[in-house]
A protein has these predicted regions:
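Alpha-helix N-cap/helix-initiation sites
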Residues: 8-10, 219
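A subset of solvent-exposed loop/turn segments in beta-rich extracellular surface proteins, enriched
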Residues: 10-36, 87-100
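Low-complexity intrinsically disordered tracts that form flexible linkers/tails across taxa
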Residues: 1-8
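Extracellular/periplasmic, surface-exposed regions of secreted and cell-surface proteins
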Residues: 1, 24-83, 99-361
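Conserved Walker B
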Residues: 364
Length: 364
């Protein structure tokens, strides 16, 4: 990076910008002085976001409620970058132009769109029978997201003031784009049971999810959870201990979660058509080629994180002082990682597989 001495001024006496001088062969002020003096470079960033949610609830019958909601999000991001040839003067009466780097005569435009939709419907039912309290919840979930990018640039602008690709007539032009889409479909439930006003507690829940990120036959996974609790302090035998200890609760739980965070199409072997060879043929343009991606794993599926936990809760001084102790064991199966090492002669990287296991434990 080259900067200027304090004796250099950004503008010559004749009003032209300073970029190079007879005393320096390096760009003065890194060329920014000339660019700012001309004032024709322009950048614009625009972001738009629209989101809405509709929700409805129904009381179907006593203790039975059904709810449904729909969410929609559209995100749009646009950029425009215009750079032009920048005039400057090295000697009096002689105008030169900066035509490389930041002085390339070019217009770039990009546009990114995200569309997201989610639909949920679920119901819950409560039932009290003597000392038994039961609550059941079950539902359905669907969500999808689509992403699309467009990028265009072209040189040879006919105007230094107008921003329109129709006014770019140069041969140097690039265009690129891309789009991705995924969908997630799932059903879920939760059952809560309480006996004797919360003396004995039980809960079970689970999800059955399917993801478009995996090949058909490997898209769905079931992830259950369950927990039990015993409030020892509510037992009759606890008796006089209540004077000093307000709450004693023993907990035991097991839970599993699914992880689908892989690429949108990792299970598909793709073809890249944007390659350019370093060879010039008769039309004086570099030849294009298509290349096949690295091999993929056909049985890539969900990563599953399972956790066992045991805990103890204590409450003192009318529950103003609370102590909690926990110990857990976590087992992560099917972690996505590079698969079996392939011979160097194969000429490609190893495909991702559910080939890694992580085991952790702790107590606090």
């Amino acid at each position: 990076v080259n900067h200027a001495l304090a004796s250099f001024v950004p503008i010559n006496p004749d009003g032209s910008a300073v970029y190079l001088t007879s005393l320096s062969n390096s760009a003065i002020l890194d060329g920014m002085g000339a660019i700012l003096a001309y004032g024709k470079h322009k950048n614009e960033d625009q972001r738009y976001e629209f989101s809405t949610t509709f929700e409805a609830s129904f009381n179907v019958m006593k203790n039975l409620n059904v709810r449904a909601n729909y969410s929609y999000l559209h995100y749009n991001y646009q950029t425009m970058n215009r750079t032009v040839n920048v005039p400057y003067s090295k000697y009096p009466g002689e105008i030169s132009y900066l035509t490389t780097g930041s002085g390339v005569n070019q217009l770039k435009e990009t546009q990114t769109n995200h569309w997201y939709q989610a639909f949920n419907v679920y119901g819950d039912y409560m039932l009290d029978i003597a000392d038994h309290q039961i609550k059941i919840m079950a539902g359905y979930n669907y969500e999808t997201k689509r992403l699309k990018d467009i990028k265009v640039s072209r040189q040879g602008l006919l105007s230094d003031d107008l921003n329109d690709l129709n006014l770019a007539v140069g041969d140097a032009m690039t265009m690129s784009g891309g789009q991705n889409e995924y969908a997630l479909l799932g059903a879920f439930y939760r059952l809560n049971y309480s006996y004797k006003g919360g003396r004995y507690l039980f809960e079970t829940s689970g999800r059955y999810d399917g993801s478009s990120r995996f090949r058909s036959g490997h898209r769905f996974g079931f992830f259950p959870s369950a927990s039990v609790g015993w409030r020892i302090s509510e037992e009759p035998f606890f008796g006089n201990l209540k004077k000093n200890i307000d709450n004693v609760k023993l907990r035991l739980s097991y839970g599993s979660l699914g992880n689908q965070q892989v690429g949108y199409y990792d299970y598909i072997q793709t073809i890249n058509t944007n390659g350019t060879m370093n060879y010039i043929f008769g039309d004086q343009k570099k030849g294009s080629y298509a290349s096949v991606s690295d091999p993929n794993s056909a049985d890539l599926t969900w990563e599953t994180v399972s956790t066992w936990n045991v805990g103890l809760d204590l409450g003192f001084l009318n529950n103003r002082l609370n102590l909690t102790a926990d110990a857990y064991v976590r087992d992560t199966k099917g972690m996505q990682t590079s698969g079996k090492k392939l011979p160097g002669a194969y000429g490609a990287n190893e495909p991702k597989q559910n080939a890694c296991l992580l085991y952790t434990s702790d107590a606090a």
